[in-house]
Design a protein with these regions (language model features):
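Structural microenvironment flanking redox-active thiols in thiol-disulfide oxidoreductases
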Residues: 92-131, 141-148
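Thiol/disulfide oxidoreductase modules built on the thioredoxin-like
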Residues: 129-134, 140-188
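Active-site acidic short loop of glycosyltransferases
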Residues: 75-77, 107, 133-134
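Hydrophobic membrane-insertion alpha-helices, especially the h-region
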Residues: 13-25
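N-terminal Sec-pathway targeting helices
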Residues: 4-16
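Short active-site neighborhood of thiol/selenol oxidoreductases, capturing the structured segment around
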Residues: 70-92
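Hydrophobic beta-strand anchors of alpha/beta hydrolase catalytic cores
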Residues: 80-81, 111, 158
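N-proximal helix/coil linker or "cap" segments that precede and/or mark the start of modular domains
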Residues: 25-58
Length: 193
């Protein structure tokens, strides 16, 4: 019986030691890794803030008027890049909200509305005209740009890019950009006034 008690005591000591080491390891890893920025307004608005910033994939796309627009030309200014589609009802509802949201903010933020079905230029133009969109609408005829941003299956998706051209977060699905949380989130992320 005494031998069984000793085995049990040794086993409990080993389990306790392993548990202690595991806790210490997890705490050290948490301290060494960059933490995700806390932002109550971004959380309530539904922004997925990226744990690690990464360089926003470059693009040069034609606008509806045929002018090539290059993302790198806007470096130094935070940007919202929204992927949308003409067949997407949520996208069509979000476009006028984004347009209204942009009023008075274009000096602080760059806005890009990328139509993923850009080969349907007439349909894109019709939606833009109906909603009186003045923001740059870019035509995406190749999936390369979507793949680089990881846009698959669900639109609208809006990517938040900081002044240095780094991706800092994104939203998936329609958002109410007219909400106070939207502007509060962007002010926090991009240090805007």
């Amino acid at each position: 019986m005494e031998a069984g008690m000793k085995k049990r005591s040794v086993l409990l000591s080993i389990i306790g030691g392993v548990t202690t080491l595991l806790i210490l390891f997890l705490q050290a890893g948490r301290a060494a890794s960059p933490s995700q920025p806390e932002s109550p307004s971004c959380n309530s608005f539904g922004v997925q803030i990226f744990q690690q910033k990464k360089e926003a994939p470059a693009f040069t796309l034609n606008s509806l008027v045929g002018k090539p627009i290059n993302l790198s030309d806007y470096k130094g200014k935070p940007a919202l890049v929204t992927f949308w589609a003409t067949w997407c009802e949520s996208c069509r509802e979000e476009l006028p909200i984004l347009e209204k949201f942009s009023i008075g903010k274009k000096d602080q933020l760059a806005f890009f509305l990328i139509a993923i079905d850009g080969e349907r230029k007439k349909t894109v133009q019709k939606i833009v005209d109906q909603n009186k969109i003045t923001l740059p609408v870019l035509l995406l005829c190749k999936e390369k740009c979507m793949d680089q941003y990881g846009v698959r299956g669900w639109v609208p998706q809006t990517f938040l890019i900081d002044r240095e051209g780094m991706l800092v977060g994104k939203t998936v699905g329609e958002r109410d950009w007219s909400s106070p949380e939207a502007w509060s989130c962007l002010k926090e992320l991009f240090n805007l006034r």
